[in-house]
Curated annotation (Swiss-Prot):
The gene is UBP3. InterPro entries: Papain-like_cys_pep_sf, Peptidase_C19, Peptidase_C19_UCH, USP_CS, USP_dom. It catalyses: Thiol-dependent hydrolysis of ester, thioester, amide, peptide and isopeptide bonds formed by the C-terminal Gly of ubiquitin (a 76-residue protein attached to proteins as an intracellular targeting signal). Residues 1-11, 260-310 have a biased composition (Basic and acidic residues). One of its GO terms (cellular component) is mitochondrion. It comes from the Eukaryota. This is Ubiquitin carboxyl-terminal hydrolase 3. It comes from Saccharomyces cerevisiae (strain ATCC 204508 / S288c). Keywords: Hydrolase, Protease, Thiol protease, Ubl conjugation pathway.
Amino acid sequence: MNMQDANKEESYSMYPKTSSPPPPTPTNMQIPIYQAPLQMYGYTQAPYLYPTQIPAYSFNMVNQNQPIYHQSGSPHHLPPQNNINGGSTTNNNNINKKKWHSNGITNNNGSSGNQGANSSGSGMSYNKSHTYHHNYSNNHIPMMASPNSGSNAGMKKQTNSSNGNGSSATSPSYSSYNSSSQYDLYKFDVTKLKNLKENSSNLIQLPLFINTTEAEFAAASVQRYELNMKALNLNSESLENSSVEKSSAHHHTKSHSIPKHNEEVKTETHGEEEDAHDKKPHASKDAHELKKKTEVKKEDAKQDRNEKVIQEPQATVLPVVDKKEPEESVEENTSKTSSPSPSPPAAKSWSAIASDAIKSRQASNKTVSGSMVTKTPISGTTAGVSSTNMAAATIGKSSSPLLSKQPQKKDKKYVPPSTKGIEPLGSIALRMCFDPDFISYVLRNKDVENKIPVHSIIPRGIINRANICFMSSVLQVLLYCKPFIDVINVLSTRNTNSRVGTSSCKLLDACLTMYKQFDKETYEKKFLENADDAEKTTESDAKKSSKSKSFQHCATADAVKPDEFYKTLSTIPKFKDLQWGHQEDAEEFLTHLLDQLHEELISAIDGLTDNEIQNMLQSINDEQLKVFFIRNLSRYGKAEFIKNASPRLKELIEKYGVINDDSTEENGWHEVSGSSKRGKKTKTAAKRTVEIVPSPISKLFGGQFRSVLDIPNNKESQSITLDPFQTIQLDISDAGVNDLETAFKKFSEYELLPFKSSSGNDVEAKKQTFIDKLPQVLLIQFKRFSFINNVNKDNAMTNYNAYNGRIEKIRKKIKYGHELIIPEESMSSITLKNNTSGIDDRRYKLTGVIYHHGVSSDGGHYTADVYHSEHNKWYRIDDVNITELEDDDVLKGGEEASDSRTAYILMYQKRN
């Protein structure tokens, strides 16, 4: 070769031009000699790799254009080679560039040449066995694409083939694959199996069983299904029904081997169905025999279970028993009921129970109780409500039939609000007013469990430094009032960084700080840390006594100091007359305390913005509850969200109406018509309602009186006044009043009052007071202090003043019990008529008693008896002294004349 020819030819290597070494003589070694190059880059490259560096896999590992030669299954034969003579062409129109000199050999395209190197007649070419890149080869058709390829991927054997010289070669050779065939990218598409129907015997039949047979697989599926049913603790009837369904599915599925409960969707051809159908009878017989054996075992197990059920009663009862069951189970149940022995109730399969539960929930969503608001979405046009009045603190101006009642706790699962983050105090207070399940939901929430101040109460005394026994006795009684502590705990979860700061909730924060010291966990952690120097001498004794009683109550040295609480009270205007060291009335302090908490919560609600109200309404997932919220928003007339209401909020209030829509004046009068017993219409009566804005405190302690004043010869025959109350004051001055029930009846007796009619005549009016609504926590005060007038010698009464009269204490014993049922005589007729729960709505249990010791009203001492629900015990707390009591000890006091301890305030809670 001259230099001019070398310049014309493009070089592929930096090494001198050499010819490929001759391949070794074919032997029986099962190793590949030459392999196709491996593409290393995403673009066209032609790297030179030695044959031993390439894995001998006959699969498309790199991409779909990877060269896979059909001779790979037979390592004795080299792949055919493209024409490397400059004058020849290939089928795929590759640009052939000469690398090595050829001496006229014959290529696979039929071009002739001299066989200078291949003189041995072995049928093998001594030229380069592969091209530099697979794109230049016309033989990169994969062997798997050929329908005629065998399991060893070899080509059709030809006994006679001509070599390059035209002579017949005796050694066997293989014809090349048809180069006109194109590579099929979708060769594994199951729809193309129709084209290979004639060769379906060589295809893999599905389902494929490895190390097993079709009958064994079906039997194993039956056993696995039975084990799953036993794990679900179902009865034998459901197992038999499932086995019948599974058996029928076994005869109709395409694969004829997979049970119904584990069936998979498969695409098969008609030819495969015929092949599988030929194999079905043998597998079906084996499965049928196995099913008979398992049914015999299930019958024995069913009898054993029936005997156990007859001997042992059912612990639980399925909630849904009215639904229709499958026919098989009905027939079995009828056969069982014919026997004289008692049979257990037929249980349902788990799928039937689940479907019935869904149906029952849907039905319960459609059915609305009489005390609930009709379920209507917010986008609706009307909202149905019940015709009864509001609950205890819903003391409205209206007696319209559109008034809705406080939603009761639901039997169905509670849908909690979807709140985001910590809410302000006003939002929490609103939820507690109108969502009866909100308090219990918050207390069950694990996220706020560690934030509440009081988890479990440990009895502790309160140090009496300056005649504050009236305050400590009230705080102790409220501490053991569980509904009140629940309200305090939920209010403690508020967002303290909201616009309504702590300055407007002084008493609430003081109560939280005070009651946190009675928490058992807090006390146990700080048992020794908070001991004063004066108490260190008794520290070890207190520790021993407390541990010996498992912290049931603390020693005297561990009493709570009320200094901070008292200091906070002195800064509140309502308690401005409170003087340190001056004795006060316990009932008066209790009333002021509840009033102040009520006002602070109302102030927090009034401070809510329109945006906060919209967020709260959006978080409510119960449509009935949402409508009830909207109807009560207008009761907060001084609130910012009412004064600056957005058009959207105004639209909602106008759509669903308001609770009090009969009068615009806060304490206005309105007229209602009545009727006599004979059915004739009487004169109209004036009705006046004193409105109280709802708060968590008023919902808990607030009730309502109905005072009826009958005026003869007057324009209005009756005057009805609805007044709220937090404490019922019972007069016990009458000699016939010796027990609590008689005091209630005496409370509702009519009294005659002088009255001037509308015509100007003096008449005698008759007045009666009834209980219209009962609170959840009933506070009762005995009127033990009465004013006694001095009488002169002529038996003429003198002026009513402090100089001519005196205040004396009524020290007689008033009997009361642990249970109280409000007599019907004390309830209003409307309440009794609308009451659906009967006597249970008037049933209470005793939880606290405040005693007064002494004979005068301006002195004496206060103690308290409290019921600890967690310990199920009564404790008597006298400042720092705590004594455990029997139940009967609480009912004693005042029997003897020398005993000045008499019950003054009773606390009753409604029984759940």
